[in-house]
Amino acid sequence: MNSFRRGMVLASLALAGGLASAQAFPERELSGVIMWGAGGATDVVARAVAPMAEEALGKKIVLQNRSGGSGAISTNFVNQQPSDGYTLLLGAENPQLHGVLGIGDLDYSKFYPVNILGRGIVVIVANKDKPWKSFKDLLADIQANPGKVKMGSTGPGGLPHSVGSMIGTVTKMPVTAVPFDGEGPGLTALQGGHVDFMPVGLGADSENIKAGRVKAIAVLSSQPHEGIPALTGDLPAIGKYLPWGPFYGVFVKRDVPDAVKARLTTAFKTAASNPKFVDLMVGRGNAVMNISGAEADAFLKKWQSVTAWTLQEAGVAKRSPADLGIARP
């Protein structure tokens, strides 16, 4: 056998082996990297869907929280792993803003959306001992005492930062942002009186609201939600950005083999359709989306466009969306 034929045979065997490996996926346990810390909305959603995906895949998904850098730590970590589908990124919306905020160049365009599980409802919650009964009361206090009211934050690109920036484009809101490593620690600080208010995903705080440990003074919507007043009632101008909210999804590197992507997509579609998961999501104030592939990519691009240009308008973007090729909404 000459060298050319030998090379062709070896290449064919390698390709066949790769296809067989992809079709047999998964052959061992998977790693699920959660973008934010324990107790936050992303963590809650990830830990709810993982057992159902394990059942569909027939293998364990070992979960680990790897927070930091507004999601950049986990995103970079997963991007550095082999393109075999065994490392999943269980993340939220944050990487879509890393470019405009100067955090990094890695966003979800470099990843395949296995499943956008759902999107959240945003509420503005306050320490239960504060006198505010509405967002109007909170805003009046903020404007009367510039820099004295403390807002819990998760850093640039996090949900509180994005919502605060949106509000800041339509009214003056001179607060002091106090950063935490995820919604969970921020909400703990809120209950302890270390910060005064915090915009969060309802999924992260519904139990605290129901138990009276914090009070919800507005929902980022044009319609009330379960007795929580719509923010547009006190701030009509915010309506131009609505509907808007965080989202939660499962991602792998874009160059993972197609057969592996298909296997993961099917498994998580089944998991996200499970009535127990749907009930948990809805019960925590989330809308189930359960989309993947091209449909999910279109959603991600639209969300990035709306939010990146909002940050540009608010004057907090470090880089122009136009320079990053992000089209105006």
Feature annotation, model-predicted:
Residues 27-29, 210, 262-329:
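An extracytoplasmic/periplasmic, membrane-proximal ligand-sensing/linker region
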Residues 93-95, 119, 129, 202-203, ...:
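Solvent-exposed coil/turn segments that connect beta secondary-structure elements
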Residues 3-9:
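N-terminal export leaders
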Residues 30, 39, 46, 63, ...:
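Residue-level signal for nonpolar/aromatic packing positions in well-ordered secondary structure
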Residues 53, 77-86, 99-185, 231, ...:
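Hinge/capping helix and adjacent helix->loop/strand transition within the periplasmic-binding protein
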Residues 23-110, 148, 171-197, 201, ...:
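N-terminal (or domain-start) structured segment
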Residues 17-21:
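N-terminal signal peptide c-region/cleavage motif recognized by signal peptidases
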Residues 205-273, 319-322, 326-329:
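C-terminal lobe and pocket-closing loops
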